[in-house]
């Protein structure tokens, strides 16, 4: 069995997990998430309140789906209890971010400000003019929104200017040699 897939998924108090055919719905204090399970995989609820992900055979694809499904359901439970956050930093002279209602307005060296609207289930928090946080209950959506914002002005390798994840190391290059 998959080493990750065979681990039981603990369901904390205050979280309600419903298994309806191939659909798993997780309700918690922060919201509701739904996931459709791939064909050969099954999810069972045990008497002790944990979830068990099972697979029928040891085919390569099935083994991969086994661990993936277990991790996705565990992330759904974490999302509806604690939520997920991704912190981004802005480096560069004149580069900054400010909140405009629920939107973010970036000054990134373009001739115009760039406005980013949060999709449903995502919220933004501006900590300083050069640091902000993307919050949400869906880990995939939080990461996707953060990656799209980073794409607006990727960190460039010569001066390191741009939008980066907190703690990200930007590989620097040496500039051209002068005379």
From Swiss-Prot:
Gene3D superfamilies: Ribosomal protein L6, alpha-beta domain. The keyword Transcription does not apply. GO terms for biological process: cytoplasmic translation. SUPFAM superfamilies: Ribosomal protein L6. Keywords: Ribonucleoprotein, Ribosomal protein, RNA-binding, rRNA-binding. InterPro entries: Ribosomal_uL6-like (IPR000702), Ribosomal_uL6-like_a/b-dom_sf (IPR036789), Ribosomal_uL6_a/b-dom (IPR020040), Ribosomal_uL6_bac-type (IPR019906), Ribosomal_uL6_CS (IPR002358). GO terms for molecular function: rRNA binding; structural constituent of ribosome. Pfam families: Ribosomal_L6. It comes from the Bacteria. GO terms for cellular component: cytosolic large ribosomal subunit. This protein binds to the 23S rRNA, and is important in its secondary structure. It is located near the subunit interface in the base of the L7/L12 stalk, and near the tRNA binding site of the peptidyltransferase center. Part of the 50S ribosomal subunit. Belongs to the universal ribosomal protein uL6 family. This is Large ribosomal subunit protein uL6. It comes from Acidothermus cellulolyticus (strain ATCC 43068 / DSM 8971 / 11B).
